């Protein structure tokens, strides 16, 4: 079991957002969405999230995340 600790308020968006410059974020997709991570350092990447799913995403602080539908995200820390 993984314990997740929210570090900030959850925010919802579709356009590019750094999510408080966080390194680890919890992402919730209320509808099917293609999620894109944009980076100045690494190649841009993307993945698909199905409706009602949650993923943990690790990124660099300046990297942005965006979705084709609204994403609800919050910075987190975790303990395995």
Please place each PLM-identified region on the residue numbering.
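Surface-exposed ligand/attachment interfaces on beta-rich extracellular proteins
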Residues: 5-21, 41-43
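N-terminal compositionally biased, intrinsically disordered segments and leader/signal-like regions
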Residues: 15, 19, 37, 49, ...
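Beta-sandwich interaction modules
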Residues: 16-18, 50-63, 79
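Short, solvent-exposed linear motifs at loop/edge-of-secondary-structure regions
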Residues: 19-29
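Noncatalytic modules at the cell exterior or secretory-pathway interfaces
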Residues: 23-25, 57-71
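Short, surface-exposed beta-strand/strand-loop-strand elements in extracellular ectodomains
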Residues: 28-46
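Exposed low-complexity, polar/acidic, P/S/T/G-rich flexible segments that act as propeptides
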Residues: 71-80
């Amino acid at each position: 079991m993984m314990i997740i600790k929210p570090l900030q308020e959850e925010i919802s968006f579709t356009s590019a957002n750094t999510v408080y410059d966080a390194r680890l974020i919890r992402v919730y997709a209320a509808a099917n969405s293609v999620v894109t991570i944009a980076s100045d350092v690494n190649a841009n990447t993307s993945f698909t999230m199905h409706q009602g799913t949650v993923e943990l995403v690790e990124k660099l602080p300046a990297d942005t995340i965006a979705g084709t539908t609204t994403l609800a995200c919050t910075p987190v820390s975790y303990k395995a």
